[in-house]
């Protein structure tokens, strides 16, 4: 095969991986767009993604009553997360009730302290690649995400692989959150801030100049309990053969973490697609920056966020278990240190549709501030 043929074959493989399509579809869109990856992906998304939630809305109108009956009949038969409209959420409340934050007066008296005060001082986050590019059961899976938001009521949510229709769905339901995105074309990242807990100051988008997959770095400046925070998320270049580009993007991320003001806490969370050797190749994390999973003792139960052995959303002929999704923390130099408190994987329950919320597990993490 010629060098040109090999190059185009690699482009087709990358397009198919990112878009969730096959090589024939990839070749068609790439050829129509002069083998420009970004143009081809944009063309694909415009053609395929916009109608996903519209179709689901029509389906819901017809089958809404029946689905309530079916859900009732199915309850207790299998371990599944309930996502019907009644149970899913009302995220409109500023202080939703959930098992994590509710404490009875009796328990508070028994313990001698008001636990809610302790909980209020903790910062909670969720980071999740929601696989918006997979349109199968996408509305069901978006409702699943909303159920987890209602359960955990995180202060900050970092999301990757969003599409415009998914964002509009979330904005209609998660009205207690401020939402901003890394783009409005194709697929992109986003950050959600709980309005009653986090004050937004400003945001910026840092482009990765040589990305072939529309990737960038989204940064938000906020305050939490009077403390300045820099929140960052990204979806670094995918695929094993994109290690060089992914490493370049990691260098940009780490440089931006180092450049943040000394009086600010920095939290980066996202789908890095990183292998440990790639982190080592850039000299490891800078002084003062920690990998939260490592800081918490490298707990095995929350190591693999991409796990085709346990997660059946993607049909692949091999087992792949990787720690693609990572959280980096840098404390402020001129303020009391922030320490990781707890980390867990979420999204490990199947939804009523028989699939998981995403092909990635989400990460729920809390910090002592």
From Swiss-Prot:
Gene3D superfamilies: DNA helicase RuvA subunit, C-terminal domain (1.10.8.10), Endonuclease/exonuclease/phosphatase (3.60.10.10)
Location in or out of the cell: Nucleus; Nucleus, PML body
UniProt note on tissues of expression: Expressed ubiquitously during blastula stages and throughout gastrulation. Shortly after shield formation, expressed weakly in dorsal forerunner cells (DFCs). Between somite stages 5 and 9, expressed in the tailbud and around the Kupffer's vesicle at a higher level than the more uniform expression in the embryo.
GO biological process: convergent extension involved in gastrulation; determination of left/right symmetry; double-strand break repair; gastrulation; negative regulation of transforming growth factor beta receptor signaling pathway
InterPro entries given in the database record: Endo/exonu/phosph_ase_sf (IPR036691), Endo/exonuclease/phosphatase (IPR005135), TDP2-like (IPR051547), UBA-like_sf (IPR009060)
Renumbered residue ranges of the record's region Disordered: 58-77
Cofactor(s) this protein requires: Mg(2+); Mn(2+)
A single Gene Ontology CC term: PML body
Chief location of this protein within or outside the cell: nucleus
One Pfam match: UBA_4
Site feature (Interaction with 5' end of substrate DNA) residues: 187, 306, 324, 360
GO MF term list: 5'-tyrosyl-DNA phosphodiesterase activity; DNA binding; magnesium ion binding; manganese ion binding; nuclease activity; single-stranded DNA binding; tyrosyl-DNA phosphodiesterase activity
EC number: 3.1.4.-
Cofactor, free-text remark: Binds 1 magnesium or manganese ion per subunit.
Annotated active site: 271 (proton donor/acceptor)
Biased composition (Basic and acidic residues): 59-71
Source taxon at top rank: Eukaryota
Start and end residues of each stretch annotated as Interaction with 5' end of substrate DNA: 129-133, 235-240, 273-275
Keywords linked to the UniProt accession: Developmental protein, DNA damage, DNA repair, Hydrolase, Magnesium, Metal-binding, Nuclease, Nucleus
Amino acids binding Mg(2+): 131, 161
Function as written in the Swiss-Prot or TrEMBL entry: DNA repair enzyme that can remove a variety of covalent adducts from DNA through hydrolysis of a 5'-phosphodiester bond, giving rise to DNA with a free 5' phosphate. Catalyzes the hydrolysis of dead-end complexes between DNA and the topoisomerase 2 (top2) active site tyrosine residue. Hydrolyzes 5'-phosphoglycolates on protruding 5' ends on DNA double-strand breaks (DSBs) due to DNA damage by radiation and free radicals. Controls gastrulation movements and left/right (L/R) axis determination via smad3-mediated regulation of cdh1/e-cadherin.
Family in the record: Belongs to the CCR4/nocturin family. TTRAP/TDP2 subfamily.
Protein name: Tyrosyl-DNA phosphodiesterase 2
Organism: Danio rerio
């Amino acid at each position: 095969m010629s060098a040109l043929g090999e190059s185009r074959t690699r482009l087709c493989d990358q397009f198919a991986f990112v878009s969730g399509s096959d090589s024939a579809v990839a070749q068609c869109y790439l050829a129509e767009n002069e083998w420009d990856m970004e143009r081809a992906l944009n063309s694909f998304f415009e053609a395929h993604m916009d109608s996903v939630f519209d179709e689901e809305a029509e389906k819901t109108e017809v089958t809404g009553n029946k689905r309530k009956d079916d859900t009732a009949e199915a309850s207790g038969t299998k371990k599944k997360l309930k996502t019907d409209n009644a149970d899913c959420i009302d995220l409109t409340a500023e202080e939703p009730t959930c098992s994590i934050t509710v404490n009875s007066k009796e328990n508070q008296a028994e313990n001698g302290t008001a636990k809610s005060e302790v909980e209020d001082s903790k910062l909670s986050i969720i980071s999740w690649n929601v696989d918006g590019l997979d349109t199968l059961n996408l509305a069901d899976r978006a409702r699943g995400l909303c159920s987890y938001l209602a359960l955990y009521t995180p202060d900050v949510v970092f999301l990757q692989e969003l599409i415009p229709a998914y964002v509009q769905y979330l904005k209609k339901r998660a009205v207690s959150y401020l939402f901003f995105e890394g783009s409005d074309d194709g697929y992109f990242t986003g950050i959600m801030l709980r309005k009653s807990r986090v004050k937004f100051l400003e945001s910026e988008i840092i482009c990765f100049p040589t990305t072939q997959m529309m990737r960038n770095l989204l940064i938000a400046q906020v305050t939490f309990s009077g403390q300045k925070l820099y929140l960052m998320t990204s979806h670094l270049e995918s695929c094993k053969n994109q290690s060089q580009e992914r490493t370049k993007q990691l260098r940009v991320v780490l440089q931006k973490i180092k450049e943040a003001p000394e009086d600010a806490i920095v939290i980066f969370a996202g789908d890095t697609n990183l292998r440990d050797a790639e982190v080592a190749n850039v000299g490891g994390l800078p002084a003062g920056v920690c990998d939260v999973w490592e800081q918490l003792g490298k707990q095995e139960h929350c190591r693999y966020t991409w796990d085709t052995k346990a997660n059946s959303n993607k049909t692949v002929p091999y087992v792949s278990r990787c720690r693609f999704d990572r959280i980096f923390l840098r404390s402020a130099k001129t303020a009391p240190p922030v320490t990781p408190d707890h980390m867990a994987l979420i999204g490990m329950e199947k939804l009523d549709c028989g699939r998981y919320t995403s092909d990635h597990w989400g990460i729920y993490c809390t910090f002592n501030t």
